[in-house]
């Protein structure tokens, strides 16, 4: 989970999308997003000199948090990401996300593997369910272009379903969790937080509620899913 104060402002042609604050880096997703921002800001191509420079930057931000995770990410970045960057940028240009956010979600979901499939049946670069694919109008989940565009549209739809009163950054983390877990669980967590006289617009409080929901679950598979979603963000 990420605790916030100012570090990065991601800009988009439509204006500022979200702000990442000065943070204690305890989230792999946070590390991943910052790494991809570094890629966007400092690496214009994927030649060896540029990727070596980025690896040096990663060493500074990753530190001892997850050295194995960093090595896997660097390998995937060199071997897989170049093929899909333009798809992420194309999808980002048609929605309100920055391409690095879409790429970070895709890495967490599939490690940028277009043929990825989970035990629950989600597939593709953005790991969409059949229901979600139908909702966003894609016919082949393992088609990279369809998957990225579908995932981008789905993420934007989740973002827009949340109240405007939620602070922008909290709204972002909630949407990322909902993408992985499902909007119904986020909705239930917000309701439970309100019923406990908490702040349903605070990601930190929603996160704590989700942790309690995981402990109360009778279905071990759902306990795992909720915990994974919390860890995801």
Regions found by a protein language model. Name each.
Residues 71-78, 88-91, 113-116, 134-145, ...:
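Second-shell loop/turn segments in exported
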Residues 110-119, 158-161, 181-196:
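Secretory-pathway/luminal and periplasmic proteins that interact with or process carbohydrate-rich
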Residues 52-63, 173-233:
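Catalytic and substrate-binding regions of cell-wall glycan-acting enzymes that process beta-1,4-linked
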Residues 115-139, 146-157:
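Substrate-binding/active-site groove segments that recognize
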């Amino acid at each position: 989970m990420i605790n916030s104060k100012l570090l990065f402002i991601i800009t988009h042609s439509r204006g500022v999308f979200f702000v990442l604050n000065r943070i204690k880096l305890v989230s792999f997703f946070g590390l991943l997003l910052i790494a991809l921002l570094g890629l966007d800001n400092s690496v214009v191509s994927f030649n060896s000199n540029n990727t070596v420079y980025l690896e040096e930057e990663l060493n500074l931000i990753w530190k001892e948090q997850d050295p194995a995770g960093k090595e896997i990410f660097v390998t995937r970045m060199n071997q897989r990401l170049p093929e899909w960057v333009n798809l992420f940028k194309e999808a980002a240009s048609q929605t309100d996300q920055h391409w690095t956010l879409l790429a970070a979600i895709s890495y967490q979901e599939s490690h940028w593997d277009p043929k990825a499939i989970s035990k629950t049946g989600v597939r593709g670069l953005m790991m969409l369910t059949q229901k979600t694919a139908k909702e966003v109008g894609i016919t082949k989940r393992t088609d990279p272009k369809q998957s990225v565009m579908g995932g981008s549209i789905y993420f934007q739809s989740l973002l827009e379903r949340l109240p405007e009163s939620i602070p922008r950054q909290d709204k972002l983390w909630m949407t990322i969790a909902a993408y992985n877990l499902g909007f119904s669980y986020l909705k239930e967590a917000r309701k439970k937080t309100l019923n406990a006289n908490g702040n349903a617009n605070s990601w930190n409080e929603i996160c704590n509620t989700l942790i309690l929901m995981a402990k109360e679950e009778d279905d071990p598979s759902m306990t795992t899913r909720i915990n994974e979603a919390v860890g995801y963000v």
